[in-house]
């Protein structure tokens, strides 16, 4: 594959993956090469070759930026070659046209023109052709790289200071909707209040949240709006938990009070029954003593009546048993 001598077409682009297939083909200067007939392995090899050529090719824009910054900076691509471009085994041998038809849901035979198939599938709405699709969109939709891995935030090594003589600088990231990617519950005001200290080397945050390159010690800590937003979000939940806990404590106290009252009433009932039984026992013992005394008196009275007044004369006397 032959590249243009000056490489200006590629150097003017911020990323090769933002080029469409037609632009990429014209930038390479190989109009006779048909990307649709290539398989996915050949397409990736061409992209990687163009990446290496773009990194080596001198560009006027890069030279002027290097003069302002102080040293040359290597262009950071939104899709990393080593970690994210991994072809599945079933996809590596497919041609670009076959993959594009699978993406668009056209199906059809291999000899069918992709543009004609797209026009026949949706006559009311014009479908984009393969040449109008960017490389990044094609790779993401084909499943070569996940969409979240394709999104990369680049922090430049220097940014304009907000206050002279301080290391607090204006954020270099452009937030489209005022929200930080991957951070939930951060208001636009909190995102605008963020400040980032300038690192000595570029710091790249890829889509997986991994920090690549640079010195992390120069980054300033997260400011207070994050904590405020999280506290506001967690407030109602904490209040509900406390309210449920208080209601549970009140119910437990009421249940314990009812249990103590039932126990006390049962004890008092038992004590009353014991006292009543004691009184009955005392009365029965008294009646028993009276009955025994009455029986004894009746027995003595009968004996007296049978013996009469001579009963006292009967007594034992000693008889003479010795020799006369």
UniProtKB/Swiss-Prot annotation:
The annotated region (Basic motif) lies at: 244-263
InterPro entries with a match to the protein in the record: bZIP, BZIP46-like, bZIP_sf
UniProt keyword Metal-binding, yes or no: no
Where do the coiled-coil regions begin and end? none
Q: Where is this region: Disordered?
A: 106-127
A Pfam short name:
bZIP_1
Q: Which residues form the bZIP domain?
A: 242-287
Q: Which one of the record's GO molecular function terms can you name?
A: sequence-specific DNA binding
Composition bias type Low complexity, residue spans:
115-124
The protein's matches in PROSITE patterns, at most eight in alphabetical order, are given as: BZIP, BZIP_BASIC
Q: What does this protein do, in the record's words?
A: Transcription factor involved in abscisic acid (ABA) signaling pathway. Transcription factor activity is fully activated by ABA. Acts as a positive regulator of the expression of abiotic stress-responsive genes through an ABA-dependent signaling pathway. Acts as a positive regulator of ABA signaling and drought stress tolerance. Plays an important role in ABA and auxin responses. Involved in ABA signaling and stress responses by directly binding to the ABA-responsive element (ABRE)-containing genes, especially WRKY family genes. Modulates response to auxin.
PANTHER family in the record, alphabetically?
A: ABSCISIC ACID-INSENSITIVE 5-LIKE PROTEIN 5-RELATED, CAMP-RESPONSE ELEMENT BINDING PROTEIN-RELATED
Please describe the quaternary structure of this protein: Interacts with MODD. Interacts with SAPK2, SAPK6 and SAPK9.
Please tell me what else the database record remarks about this protein.
Answer: Plants over-expressing BZIP46 display increased sensitivity to abscisic acid (ABA).
Protein name listed in UniProt: bZIP transcription factor 46
The protein's organism comes out as Oryza sativa subsp. japonica (Rice)
Query: Which gene is annotated as encoding this protein in its UniProt record?
Result: BZIP46
């Amino acid at each position: 594959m032959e590249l243009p001598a000056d490489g200006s077409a590629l150097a003017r682009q911020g990323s090769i993956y933002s080029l469409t297939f037609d632009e990429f083909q014209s930038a390479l200067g190989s109009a006779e090469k048909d990307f649709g007939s290539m398989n996915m392995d050949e397409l990736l090899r061409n992209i990687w070759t163009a990446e290496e050529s773009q990194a080596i090719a001198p560009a006027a824009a890069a030279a002027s930026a290097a003069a302002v910054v102080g040293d040359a900076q290597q262009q950071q691509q939104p899709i990393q070659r080593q970690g994210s471009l991994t072809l599945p085994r079933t996809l590596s041998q497919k041609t670009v046209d076959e993959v594009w038809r699978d993406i668009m849901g056209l199906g059809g035979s291999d000899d069918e023109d992709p543009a004609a198939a797209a026009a026949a599938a949706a006559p009311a709405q014009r479908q984009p052709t393969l040449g109008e699709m960017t490389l990044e969109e094609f790779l993401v939709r084909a499943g070569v790289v996940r969409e979240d891995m394709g999104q990369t935030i680049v922090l430049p090594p220097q940014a304009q200071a907000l206050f002279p003589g301080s290391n607090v600088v204006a954020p270099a990231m452009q937030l489209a909707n005022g929200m930080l990617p991957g951070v939930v519950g951060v208001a636009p005001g909190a995102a605008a209040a963020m400040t980032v200290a300038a690192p000595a080397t570029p710091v790249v945050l890829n889509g997986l949240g991994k920090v690549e390159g640079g010195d992390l010690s120069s980054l300033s800590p997260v400011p207070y709006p994050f904590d405020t937003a999280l506290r506001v979000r967690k407030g109602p939940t904490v209040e509900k938990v406390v309210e449920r806990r208080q209601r549970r404590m009140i119910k437990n106290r009421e249940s314990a009070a009812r249990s103590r009252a039932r126990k006390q009433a049962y004890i008092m009932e038992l004590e009353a029954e014991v006292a009543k039984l004691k009184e009955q026992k005392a009365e029965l013992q008294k009646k028993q003593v009276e009955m025994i005394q009455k029986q004894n008196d009746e027995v003595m009275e009968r004996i007296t009546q049978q013996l009469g007044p001579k009963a006292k004369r009967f007594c034992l006397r000693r008889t003479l048993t010795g020799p006369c």
